[in-house]
Each structure stands twice: as structure tokens, then as C-alpha cells.
Amino acid sequence: MGKSETIILDEAAISRALTRIAHEILEHNQGTDNVALVGIRTGGDHLALRLQSRLQDIEGVTVPLGTVDITMYRDDLASRGSLPVGKTDIPFPVDGKRIILVDDVLFTGRTIRAAMDALMDIGRPRNIQLAVLVDRGHRELPIRPDFVGRNVPTAASEQVMVRFDDQLRPVEVCLSKP
Amino acid sequence: MAFNHKHILGIEQMSAEDITLILDTAESFKDVSLRSIKKVPTLRGKTVINVFFEASTRTRTSFEIAGKRLSADTVNISASTSAVVKGETLEDTAKNLEAMKPDIIVMRHSCSGAPHYLAERCDFSVINAGDGAHEHPSQALLDLLTIRQKKGHIEGLTVAIIGDITHSRVARSNVYALNKLGAEVRLCGPGTMLPPGIERLGAQVFDRIDDAVSGADVVMMLRIQQERQGKTMLPSLREYSMFYGLTPDRMKLAKPDAIVMHPGPMNRGVEISSAVADGPQNVILDQVENGVAVRMALLYLVSGGEKLEDSAQ
């Protein structure tokens, strides 16, 4: 039996959500002082780039942007095998920064835990805040996002996917039912 | 692409895609060694035993550091401290090690095929850290990573490997690896150090170093393995140095941007002059640095290999 898919956010809705998150980041941090964005590969890094552009449009400031690959920090090597390891690229000192960790979908929280471990190994940020486009619930760890594009109640068996075009722009968020 | 090898026994069994995946993974792991906290939790809870039945400083230390940087528990066993000196067979040693439930055994042995023997009989993953005159896959992979970093590509390059080809597992693994990635390989050494039929591996054979080095992008010098030489192989080290030693004048025959490699340890003044060994074209310490990253990649990839094989069935 085939899967059924529902589009829960289209391109315009994603754009509005990212703009709102950018405003919330600025309000929460009272500007861009010491703020830096770090996207989680892959998906979060593309969204972090969009947020950087939004912050630039609103404040006229280009905040530092980095990317973190969490493959080395996953806790499921035994069950999933050795996945391809990507590059972590954080071209600024992490120490003392207010890091906005960006991911596309927040699910169990294990990816975020791994990303925080990876960041802590690189330096000592002042704090880490979490921005996600979709929070679908089913947390297995005590992790709560600071900025959310859309809360989407889901069943554990469903999938939520953020699709990007060739220019890595987010075009839709789909909910897939088995 | 998935890596579905449980063991790393030699380059001969690998595809070009396998080699590229290992090099790409090593590039990512190299960043870990450049941080202030040089450790990731990737292999937490895994046990790696380095069993070295032959003397080694560089390779053993490199594997040990690689394991530790991935948070594995690493244990070293050398021939002098193993029960082999008390007459235990390799199979009995292996079975005893297996009973201690290691995940990976890194093995160096003077007999070609010893790691294969172990891999067929035991449950753990085996990584060949050099077996006799057969293969030294991790050395060839770190050589390829160094070449790729310095040249940007491997395909189309001309690589001259010079020295004791007969006894060199490094040369054999490099011929396989470079051929698979599309490089032209030249082998050069005195007739007594070139095994008959070596060209069947896919390399051109030269007896004059000047011809082998001319126009080369990479010049890889091999150590004269004095401990393995019979009296009939070399009249004298001085004569070898005169005819096959890499000097600044000979390097001028290679391409201007050619790099000089050596798997170490070097016999300065024998196969390579100090002026070349310390010159601007040498990448010998880059090879050592890349060795840790390549071995991290191998430990990581074989740790998932078994599961991927299972899931493919």
C-alpha cells in the first residue's frame, strides 16, 4: 500500500515562519550582539542560511554562520551502520557566542543532543538556543525548542520531510502517513 | 554509498568507490585532530586490539591514536609480550583474543595472509596493518589522501615508486590503489629488487631512476629494508645510493610541482638525500598526519560494515 502525503507548509508559509523566527531571535537576544547561527546538516544548514539572510534584511548585520555534522556523535552506530561522515564547518570562535542551533524537524531530540555535544567539543558558547521549522513531538530527551515555525502533532509512524529546490531553498513541508 | 566490508585486508579487494569513500571519510575525521578537544564519541564502548607481531612505531601509534580519538578502548599487544614467544599458534592466540570480545583487531604480521587467516576464523573485524611482503592498505590509503590533498585529484597523475619493490607491501598496495583511481604507476629499482612479472600488477617497470622520475607528479621513495636484505641483493648501500638515491638533481627531472613521499622510516643518505627529505617538495609529515585520519576512517567504517552486510541480505 502506498504512502499518502499532505503538504503542511508551502513555500509562502515557510517563508513567513522563517521571518517570524528571525524576529523572535532578535527580540530574545536584544539584537545580534554575539549571536551566531549553526545549521545541522543536512536541512538545518540550508535553513540557517535563510535565517542569516532574514536577520541581514531586518537588522543590516551579517551574523556568523556555521554548519555542524553530527554523524560522529550519533548514538546508533550499532543499529544503523557507518553513515557517511560530513564536514563540520564553524569558521568563527564558538567561545562566548549565543549559538542559534537550527534544524528542519525536531523529533526525538537525539540529533539536537548530538549537535550540542559536537558544539561543546569545539568551544564553550555562552548559551545554545534551538530554532526548528517543524516540531513534531515524540521527544525521547528533555529538549525544548526556543523558536518554532510550526507545531505539528504526528503519530510516531508518520514522517515529516522538508523539501528543498536546486538552490537549496525550502519549498514545502510534507507529512507522510504509512 | 554504503561501505559493506567487515574487514580491511587489502586494497586488491576494494573498488574505486570504496577507496574514495574512505578518503572522503578521512577528510572529515582529519578536522577532529585539528581541534583543541581531539576526541569524538563515535566508537564509545568498542574495543580495538592492536596486535603487532612485527616491530612498528608509526603504524601502531597511529592506529592507537585513531582509536582513542574515536573513544574506543585500545589495547596493544606486541610479539615480545604475547604468548607467541611461548609457542602459541596464531589460531590459538586469535581464539583467546576472541574470547575477550574485541570489536576490531588491527594486525601486523611477518607472514603474508595472516590477517586473512584470522578474518576467516573469528567474529571480530580485522584490519591489516601490514602482512609480510603482501599488502599495507592503510599506508596506501594515507598516501592517496596526501596525493589528493596536494594535487587535487589522482586520475591522470604519474607516480614513480622507487626502491625495494620485492619486499615492499607499501608498493603493492599503492599499485592497486593508484591503478583503481586512474593514475599511471612506474616502479623502479635494481633488478634484484624487482620481482619478475611485477608489471602484471599494472605498472611500468624501469631500471634507471632518471627515467622513472622524468615527468613524474609524485616520487615515492621506499626504505631499503636492511633487515630483510640478503647479501646478493645489494653490493653496498653506497652503490645503491649512487644509482637509486633521490637527490636534488634527480628531482629536477620530475615536474616542477612534483611531491616527494616516503612511508618511513627513512634511511637518510641511502634512498633519499637529506636535502630532498627536508626540501620544499617533501610531504612526508603530511603523510604521517593523514595516517591518523585514514585509520580513524577505517575503524569507523568497519564498525558499521557488518550491519550493512546483514541489512543487504
Swiss-Prot record, chain B:
Domain of life of the organism encoding this protein: Bacteria
UniProt-annotated binding residues for carbamoyl phosphate: 58-59, 108, 136, 139, 264-265
EC assignment: 2.1.3.2
GO biological process: 'de novo' pyrimidine nucleobase biosynthetic process; 'de novo' UMP biosynthetic process; amino acid metabolic process
Transmembrane spans: none
Keyword Transferase applies: yes
Cross-referenced Gene3D superfamilies: Aspartate/ornithine carbamoyltransferase
InterPro entries: Asp/Orn_carbamoyltranf_P-bd, Asp/Orn_carbamoylTrfase, Asp/Orn_carbamoylTrfase_sf, Asp_carbamoyltransf, Asp_carbamoyltransf_Asp/Orn-bd
A GO cellular component annotation in the UniProt record: cytosol
Keywords: Pyrimidine biosynthesis, Transferase
Catalytic activity entry: carbamoyl phosphate + L-aspartate = N-carbamoyl-L-aspartate + phosphate + H(+)
Recorded family membership: Belongs to the aspartate/ornithine carbamoyltransferase superfamily. ATCase family.
Role: Catalyzes the condensation of carbamoyl phosphate and aspartate to form carbamoyl aspartate and inorganic phosphate, the committed step in the de novo pyrimidine nucleotide biosynthesis pathway.
Residues that, per the record, bind L-aspartate: 86, 169, 223
Subunit structure: Heterododecamer (2C3:3R2) of six catalytic PyrB chains organized as two trimers (C3), and six regulatory PyrI chains organized as three dimers (R2).
Protein name per the record: Aspartate carbamoyltransferase catalytic subunit
Single GO MF annotation: amino acid binding
PANTHER family membership: ASPARTATE CARBAMOYLTRANSFERASE, ORNITHINE CARBAMOYLTRANSFERASE, MITOCHONDRIAL
EC top class named in words: transferase
Listed pathway(s): Pyrimidine metabolism; UMP biosynthesis via de novo pathway; (S)-dihydroorotate from bicarbonate: step 2/3
